[in-house]
Amino acid sequence: MRTSGPVIEIRAACAADASTMAAIHAACFAKSWDAAEIGSFLGVPGCLALLASISPAQAPQGFLIVRSAGDEAELLTLAVDQACRRLGVASALLAAATGALRGAGSKRLFLEVDEGNSAARDLYQSLGAVVVGRRPRYYEHGADADIFSLAL
């Protein structure tokens, strides 16, 4: 008997979510964004911020922020609580975001990934993203960033 995965609820983030998002971001990245930095994207035209919760959890376990301009968009950040990884949270966030971006007229999504982050690379490649460039020594720890492009 096959069981389905968890139910993942996606909703738009608002200013009141900035502290929660900052806490998730801090747990995921050495150079994290604080609530003020995250809040600077919330409610801004051209920015989309989504939160994911595994039902019936009350607190979000992941989020993403994308910014669009013209027919292109950029994934600014995606963070998922470590305890909830590999449960489909990032995939659900990306599916919701790409659907919204498509609906708004975006044709392509760009993002940077640490060359050593194989889980993220695998996820984006599974969605059809391809490497289109590289930013040498992009991260503070000296790693390069691969630039991915995903046709929407």
Per-segment meaning from a language model:
Residues 1-2, 47, 108, 114, ...:
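Conserved catalytic core of the tyrosine transesterase superfamily
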Residues 2-5, 12-87, 91-104, 151-152:
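Acetyl-CoA-dependent GNAT
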Residues 29, 63, 84, 123, ...:
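Conserved hydrophobic/aromatic "anchor" residues
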Residues 36, 112, 125, 130-146:
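Conserved catalytic-core motifs of GNAT/GCN5-like acyltransferases
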Residues 81, 114-116:
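Residue-level recognition of the GNAT/N-acetyltransferase active site
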Residues 94, 117-120, 137-142:
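Short glycine/proline-centered loop/turn elements that form peptide/ligand docking sites
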Residues 101-112, 135:
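Conserved GNAT acetyl-CoA-binding A-motif
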